[in-house]
């Protein structure tokens, strides 16, 4: 999938920053344009894209680093949870995390949100490592990860809010000298950005689109749906936009549309599994005497969940369950306050937490009378994942050159030309229309 990965508008903006650093030694101290306007703070994306291009002058080099970030994310997550999950549950973790079409889609091409999976796993690991006592390096890495993630994508606010709630509920302790030093070290890339803001304040003041709380009106259900869909085969956006004309050598009249229909119907039903798992995770077993009325019952249930189910348990497994609940609450808060409509990539930093309810629910089922059925369904799910991944690798817009639509953000008209397109093998892989009046152009790439 890395070899077949293509570049669109966002990728060209990122590659322009990395290429200018690798080829011309020019450091761009700010990131890609944001959906709310302005530029992302800090030049960490320039470094993340530029360093791989120094080793391999190809547009797929940064995607290799993205894949390494995802490998490290899974290794860190599995290492953190191996003492708290049964062997079969670790197999489910591999099935639902590593072989997940959502995860492998984000793991194999260049994009800002694709780096965030690692910071999500780092967040869980560093918090769990301080469940009983504060430690220097976990606190250092916890805060450093938050600050670096902030410079990559603003959706890191999900982890920031989760950290605050975890700390308030005493899910982890903080080694304050380590936390402060971690924040200062990770903030070093912000110094050139701050100097640039003084000279060109428009990169900050341009961020005026949307309004605080828009998510409560438009996007909260979307955010919750993505939380559930991350642990399923119910994909969205362009993951099911299949077109195999490039492979078939002609038009694709039935295979792509047929798989799209299958993905939106049969595979879409797999979201029922994470829905049931999340309902079980939030279940309150003991009924409390409450006053009549729906509002009173809802309030009593909320208090019971918060007081009983979100306090740290005596076991690591109870801690993990509480961590997942708090991440979900953090998602509700941030999605509600979001100034823009919640999109699928804005929640992937919580991907590691979103898949855990199914692991914690299906794992114990394998030790009951439903064991044979659970194993059988897991094998069916594995086959469906592998087939779906092959279809994504050969049929979706990010992994094919032919059959693009205008809304795909691929191969649209470019206003100028640049040596970058040939040095990074972009034109050799999938050529773009160049020197078209009225076309688009990467924000920092000089023409010519």
Where do the model's predicted regions map?
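Extracytosolic helix-loop segments that constitute the early lumenal/periplasmic catalytic or substrate-binding loops
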Residues: 12-47, 55, 214-218
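Transmembrane-helix motifs of polytopic, lipid-linked glycan transferases
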Residues: 64-85, 122, 272-277
